Amino acid sequence: MLTIDNLEDLAISLGVTLCTHVGGKKGLWNAPRRAISIRRGLHPVAHLCTLAHEVGHATLGHDSAAVGWWRAKQELAANRWAARRLITIEEYAAAERIHPSLSGVAHELGVTVFMVEAWQEMYRSGTYARFLMDA
């Protein structure tokens, strides 16, 4: 599993500037400036998952000005990128054996419930295997 430090190092290696902001969205990707901003004061788990999502946008070359269906497609891709890198199939299986609830699985994995849901959707849809080949 990636850590905040790993993700920050990856972002920097991609030429992305990291900064913070107060209030508003948890995270922002600004493609023209090649910058990621994370809201100050986030819980460490939310910080990790938000940063992973935004680094996904950067890695995938997303257009931060996209709207409509194109933006939705980019959001889904960034969610999947983050989930694939934060949760392995082995870690997920172990967490699910220990905890019957979605929130318990998320807690065990050290990620948000939203990230577990993104991982589950990717696994159910069969896209998880494609991400394994692309990793």
What are these regions (language model features)?
Residues 1-135:
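Active-site hotspot residues in diverse enzymes, especially metal/ion-binding acidic/histidine motifs
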